[in-house]
Amino acid sequence: MAKEDNMPLVTTTEMFKKAYEGGYAVGAFNVNNMEIVQGIVDAAKEEQSPLILQVSAGARKYAKHIYLVKLVEAALEDSNLPIALHLDHGDSFEICKDCVDGGFTSVMIDASHHDFDENVR
C-alpha cells in the first residue's frame, strides 16, 4: 500500500553531503530484478538507511530501463527512504543522457574503452 507524501528520488550529491555531515556511509547495490530490489530495500528499512540502487548497462539491456525505474519508484513508496537511482559504468554519453532523461538521479560514465588522450581532452 502506498504511503502518503512519499520521498522522491534524491541525488547522490545530496545523499553524500548528508552522509559526510552525519559521519556515516551509504551502501550502493547493483540491481536488475524485483527480488533483488525488494531484499535490499527491506534491509534498508530495518536499518532506516538511505541507499543507492545502481543499474549497469547490462542490467538495462536485461530488464529494460522503464521496468527498473518503476521498481525503484515502488521501492520509494514502500520504504519512504532516501534512494538514489544510479547508472553504474555507462559506456557512452548517450546512455548517460538517456538515463538522466528517464529518471535516474546519478550517472557514472566509464570511457575506459577510449585511449588516454581521448579521455583527458
PLM features: residue spans?
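Glycine-rich tight-turn/loop motif centered on a GG-T
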Residues: 24-25, 54-63, 104-119
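Glycine-enriched alpha-helix->loop->beta-strand junction motifs that scaffold or abut catalytic
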Residues: 47-49, 101-106
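Long, hydrophobic/aromatic-enriched structural stretches that serve as scaffold segments
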Residues: 87-92, 102
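N-terminal amphipathic alpha-helix/helix-capping segment at the start of soluble metabolic enzymes
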Residues: 2-27
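Hydrophobic faces of well-ordered beta-strands that scaffold small-molecule active sites
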Residues: 26-30, 51-54, 83-88, 107-109
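Active-site-adjacent beta->alpha loops and helix N-cap segments on the catalytic face
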Residues: 38, 61-69, 91-95, 112-121
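Glycine-rich, positively charged N-terminal anion/phosphate-binding segment
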Residues: 12-13, 34-79
